[in-house]
Amino acid sequence: MLLTSGQKQRPRLAQQVYRFMLDQEPLLGAAAITVHHRRLSTDGVVGWQQQEDDLEFLVEVERDLPKADYILTLIHELVHCRQTLEGNLENESREAEAYRLESIYAERFAA
């Protein structure tokens, strides 16, 4: 389940990306994921995720990103949600995998 907040267009795009990601990463379907769209530039990041409960995640994404960057960022953070569900908490391997998969999945999403 995906819940979103923020601008009119971003929640719609977030739903599209999430539905696509369920096909790529079926384990995401076991979690409740909330996506907040907000200004993160002052924090020096464009997105992050945190586990709220065993099967609940909060993903925050910079609201002013260009569409392509928004898609990459949301995919990246959803990969982190799946990694957490699997118990992969080692930061270096998490980031390497998320960066590798974000490009692959973004290309598939655009096709």
Show where each model-derived region lies.
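Catalytic Zn2+-binding segment of zinc metalloproteases
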Residues: 78-93, 97
